[in-house]
Design a protein with these regions (language model features):
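Short, well-ordered secondary-structure micro-motifs within conserved domains or adaptor modules
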Residues: 12-32
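Conserved residues at the C-terminal ends of beta-strands
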Residues: 7, 21, 116
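Active-site neighborhood of glycoside hydrolase catalytic domains
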Residues: 1-17, 61
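Histidine- and/or cysteine-centered catalytic micro-motif in compact active-site loops
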Residues: 9, 23, 69
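Substrate-binding clefts and catalytic carboxylate motifs of secreted carbohydrate-active enzymes
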Residues: 26-27, 31-147
Length: 147
C-alpha cells in the first residue's frame, strides 16, 4: 500500500504522512517554530498558515516530513528573480543560510525533509541548480550539510 498525503503542507484531513511547509530563511527562527513535538503536530505560533490539520482532525502517529522549506533566492548569476526572503548573492552567503536551515530541520523530531527546490523554474531562482540543470554551488558543498 502506498502512503497518501491529503493536502501537502497544511490543513491535513485524513493523511498517511503529515507534511509541513515553512519558508523562514533564518535557521534558528525556523527551528523555534518546531522545537518540540507539540509544535510540530499542533502548528507553529498560532498562525493559520502553519496549521498542520484542518478543524476536526488531529495527529494519529503519522511520519512527519518537512516537505517544503528553504526556497532561498540565489541571484548571483541570474540578476533578478523570485525566491523566499532576501536573495543571496554569493556562494558563502548561500551556504551559510542553507547550512542553518538544514541544521534546523535535522534537529526537529521529523522523519525527513525536502529542500525547495532542486532547480530554478521560470522566474523562480530558488533552486540548487539553474534551469539548465548546471550547479550553482558545488554539489559536494551541498552534501556536506546533509551528512
Amino acid at each position: 500500500m502506498r502512503p497518501v498525503v491529503s493536502n501537502d503542507g497544511w490543513m491535513h484531513a485524513e493523511s498517511d504522512i503529515l507534511t509541513l511547509h515553512h519558508y523562514e530563511q533564518d535557521g534558528k527562527k525556523l527551528y523555534s517554530f518546531y522545537d518540540n513535538f507539540e509544535k510540530l503536530v499542533k502548528g507553529a505560533s498560532g498562525n493559520p498558515q502553519y496549521q498542520p490539520f484542518a478543524q476536526g482532525y488531529a495527529y494519529r502517529g503519522q511520519p512527519i516530513i518537512m516537505s517544503e522549506f528553504g526556497g532561498t533566492a540565489y541571484v548571483r548569476d541570474e540578476g533578478s528573480g523570485w525566491g523566499y526572503g532576501n536573495g543571496v548573492k554569493s556562494d558563502e552567503e548561500f551556504l551559510e543560510r542553507f547550512g542553518g536551515l538544514i541544521e534546523a530541520v535535522q534537529k526537529m523530531s521529523i522523519s525527513g525533509y525536502c529542500y525547495t527546490q532542486l532547480t530554478d523554474v521560470e522566474q523562480e531562482v530558488n533552486g540548487l541548480l539553474r534551469a539548465d540543470r548546471t550547479a550553482k554551488i558545488a554539489p559536494e558543498k551541498i552534501a556536506e550539510h546533509n551528512r
